[in-house]
């Protein structure tokens, strides 16, 4: 939204997170990506859980991946920390910790305020289907970092 003076209205962090929570609870697209609060008692809305169902025609097909997203006090000005809880082998994910490397994952590397947790999860799903990730040998299903 733009005002007549040329300045933009900045939606406060908590309102933004409430919007994201509502969208995440309603479901996204084809249902292969979802997210919600990790702890309903967290009044600062910092800890979130995401789920991605692996894309078709890849080694990830049919697998369910759980992720943790942490939105610090400076979100959405800065991106959340994203970590796979489920073990996965991807070029942008640290093999020891499951943390998504912001330098190797475009959405985090080029973060903009209007990006959302939904954008992160949908782009991670697309990254799973990318030629450099779609056939990588994966850890056994059901294993965690």
From Swiss-Prot:
GO terms for biological process: positive regulation of protein polyubiquitination; postreplication repair. GO terms for cellular component: cytosol; endoplasmic reticulum; UBC13-MMS2 complex. Gene3D superfamilies: Ubiquitin Conjugating Enzyme. Induction: Not induced by stresses. Disulfide bonds: none annotated. It holds the Pfam family UQ_con. Residues 12-145 form the UBC core domain. Expressed in roots, shoots, leaves, stems and flowers, but not in pollen. Has no ubiquitin ligase activity on its own. The heterodimer with UBC catalyzes the synthesis of non-canonical poly-ubiquitin chains that are linked through 'Lys-63'. This type of poly-ubiquitination does not lead to protein degradation by the proteasome. Mediates transcriptional activation of target genes. May play a role in the control of progress through the cell cycle and differentiation. May play a role in the error-free DNA repair pathway and contributes to the survival of cells after DNA damage. Heterodimer with UBC35 or UBC36. Belongs to the ubiquitin-conjugating enzyme family. This is Ubiquitin-conjugating enzyme E2 variant 1C. It comes from Arabidopsis thaliana (Mouse-ear cress).
């Amino acid at each position: 939204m733009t005002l007549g003076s040329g300045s933009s209205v900045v939606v406060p962090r908590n309102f933004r997170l409430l919007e994201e929570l509502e969208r995440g609870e309603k479901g996204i697209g084809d249902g292969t990506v979802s997210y919600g609060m990790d702890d309903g008692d967290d009044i600062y809305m910092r800890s979130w859980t995401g789920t991605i169902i692996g894309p078709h025609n890849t080694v990830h097909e049919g697998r369910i991946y759980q992720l943790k997203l942490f939105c610090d006090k400076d979100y959405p000005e800065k991106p959340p920390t994203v970590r796979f809880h489920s073990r996965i082998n991807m070029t942008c994910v640290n093999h020891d910790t499951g943390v998504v490397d912001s330098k190797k994952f475009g959405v985090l590397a080029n973060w903009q305020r209007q990006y959302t947790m939904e954008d992160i999860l949908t782009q991670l799903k697309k990254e799973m289907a990318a030629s450099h990730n779609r056939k990588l040998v994966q850890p056994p299903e059901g294993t965690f970092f």
